[in-house]
């Protein structure tokens, strides 16, 4: 169960990132013994989610009612209109072919696409810091830090990926900046604190080689103002932003991820599988719950096997490192038609796929490139 946090346990949203020393202050970890692993130089540690009791499997479904769905039949008129729309979207394809071709044969096939989405949440802790600006410090003196899975946060909508960072309550400690040693500024590396550098024109000689007059760039001084620090000899510390102190704390990183498994049933036509994976289909079945179970007894055995394989893969990949929040599995019908047509004594082929009649034409005649016809 989630632990209710009081007002002192409020979670601060973070957006600051800075250069980090090799290890966190030992004083901080002495007060936070559960985070002592950071002393070994750990960048971040995954905290395993609490185990939850599995739900009960759903009842066996009656598939015949689902299979009553049918996509509209492909006709020669629809096939020609689909090709005309495709040609109109291409600058180098002749529309004459689409208007004059003779359709000889339509080979239709309906495919099934199975898709499994698993929306999960993982939590990682890491040590970080930011410039201290004299605001109140939420340190261990205010109480014990909550366990990372007890911290309540508002997550994104289901199946929408996101990453957010939060400050762990009661984990803060103020220390002198390790970069500038509490000065807020440090010596410029360009001029070593002098504020000036050797003139690049005369190389510090005050005069150019084989010339008697003084160097015009440095006015004969042999030195130029340092461009790195604008002549000040020092720079504001980039780590503490001139504040001289740093606020060290434990940071909680929460990642919401949507894992995807897809499978398209086998087909006998030569349309590329990657196009079919992205095709728009007609929804045949949808199952969404905190946990979904493998589909059984589907008329296409490959779909049932894909469902079993996808759920097993996601379970194995996420069980030990993330909390599954929601799962969704769908089956879609993808219509596919192979169109054989005749044009000027030759036979060609194109494919119409998806419910929105997308076209794949690999050998379309009368294509143009920069005004030249591709034969």
Curated annotation (Swiss-Prot):
GO terms for biological process: odontogenesis. GO terms for molecular function: heat shock protein binding; unfolded protein binding. Coiled coil: none annotated. It is found in: Cytoplasm; Nucleus. Disulfide bonds: none annotated. It comes from the Eukaryota. Changing residue 140 to Q: Found in patients with dentin dysplasia; likely pathogenic; decreased protein abundance; no effect on nuclear localization. Its main location: cytoplasm. Expressed in enterocytes of small and large intestinal mucosa (at protein level). Expressed in chromaffine and interstitial cells. Expressed in peripheral blood and gingival cells. The keyword Nucleus applies. One of its GO terms (cellular component) is nucleus. InterPro entries: HSP_DnaJ_Cys-rich_dom, SSUH2_homolog. Keywords: Cytoplasm, Disease variant, Nucleus. Plays a role in odontogenesis. It is linked to Defects in SSUH2 are associated with dentin dysplasia, a genetic disorder characterized by severe tooth hypermobility, short dental roots, and obliterated pulp chambers. This is Protein SSUH2 homolog. It comes from Homo sapiens (Human). The gene is SSUH2.
